[in-house]
A protein has these predicted regions:
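Catalytic Walker B motif of ABC-type/P-loop ATPase nucleotide-binding domains
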Residues: 164-167
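Conserved ABC ATPase "signature" region
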Residues: 105, 109, 117-135
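ABC transporter nucleotide-binding domain
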Residues: 183-275, 299
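Conserved ABC ATPase signature
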Residues: 139-143
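Conserved catalytic motifs of ABC-family nucleotide-binding domains
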Residues: 160
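Conserved ABC transporter NBD signature motif
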Residues: 65-73, 81
Length: 336
């Protein structure tokens, strides 16, 4: 759907499927993303995130289904799609013998930008992604993993795309670099109306940036909505109970099944979801006392995206915003 300037920045997918042998990496996904949104796409490793991005960016063909990007069919009009999008994937592909400025200028000139403007653009983009103070003679092959990711993002922005696909763009970056990327993503969306499709394993990143979020698990969308709506569906408040051992937590999970049917156990903790948590605390304590289970701590808090993720996938998303995750293994590259 076109915006008021007649520019289509939307993304749609209908009954999208991609198989790898007997593995359904993407299994019947439907999406409708209006232009001008930041769309967060979450899921465990191997859930289908990167596979769907590769379909939408014309890198992979779907086994079945249909998708459009910027109004163009990804299978029938792949060239038009590629003209309209910028892409920064997990698998960074840079010429190791070229410098950052050479790569940016080459990319810019390939899109028809005059050389003097290409040079100015290269400097601006290097500053944007925090690489402007790197030795200009340093070749991309000598860059660290985080530096390569930042350069890849800069390359994706060279032609001012309508839609930007970012596949875990801040993975492996330090907190300061991550914050700079967040600021640039928000600026691109606020000032240019750019649609941004963001896959991430950082829940705080999705919560801060995304207008809407979808969670994929085993190739299927299991939850979708605004961050606040998804958290509201979990419950208005969360009671977290802490115990001295995993065995005590497991016993408490059984003892509280009738009192708190909506709950999640993990290690020595038990999280229970209520409309009004404080009103239920006395009954929880009585039930634990009656079962002879010693409680070591109790807190009441608002639900987070961690709670949403845990509820719909049955597992926690371990990567936190201040602890960059390790590199993905080869299996994750194919199906994540």
């Amino acid at each position: 759907m076109a915006d008021h300037n007649g520019v289509d920045r939307s993304i749609t997918a209908k009954a999208m499927r991609r198989d790898f042998g007997e593995l359904h990496a993407v299994d019947g996904v439907d999406l409708e993303i209006p232009g001008g949104r930041i769309f967060g796409f979450l899921g465990p490793n191997g859930a289908g995130k990167s596979t769907l991005v590769k379909i939408l960016t014309t890198i992979l063909n779907p086994t079945a289904g249909r998708a459009t990007v910027a109004g163009y069919d990804v299978q029938k009009q792949g060239g038009k799609v590629r003209e309209a999008i910028g892409v920064a994937l997990q698998d960074v592909g840079l010429d190791p013998l070229m410098t950052a400025r050479e790569l940016l200028m080459l990319q810019s000139e390939l899109f028809g930008t005059p050389r003097d403007k290409a040079r100015t653009m290269a400097e601006r983009l290097l500053k944007t992604v925090g690489l402007d103070d790197v030795d200009p003679k340093k070749r991309a092959g000598a860059y660290s993993g985080g530096m390569k990711r930042r350069l890849d993002l800069a390359l994706a922005l060279v032609h001012d795309p309508r839609i930007l696909f970012l596949d875990e763009p801040t993975s492996g970056l330090d907190p300061a670099s991550r914050a700079a990327i967040w600021e640039e993503v928000r600026r691109l969306n606020d000032e240019l109306g750019m649609t941004i499709f963001l896959t991430t394993q950082y829940l705080e990143e999705a919560d801060r940036l995304a207008d809407e979020i979808a969670i994929i698990d085993k190739g299927r969308i299991v939850a979708q909505g605004t961050p606040s709506d998804l958290k509201r569906e979990v419950g208005d408040e969360v009671v977290e109970l802490q115990f001295g051992s995993c065995e005590d937590a497991a016993s408490a999970d059984d003892a509280l099944s009738a009192v708190a049917p909506n709950r999640q156990a993990g290690g020595r903790e038990l999280r229970l979801y209520f409309g009004r948590a404080a009103e239920n605390v006395p009954e929880l304590v009585r039930a634990l006392d009656g079962a002879g289970i010693r409680l070591q701590g109790l807190t009441i808090e608002q639900p987070s995206l961690d709670d949403v993720f845990l509820r719909v996938t049955g597992e926690a998303l371990e990567h936190k915003v201040d602890a960059p995750p390790p590199g993905d293994d080869k299996r994750a590259e194919v199906t994540s």
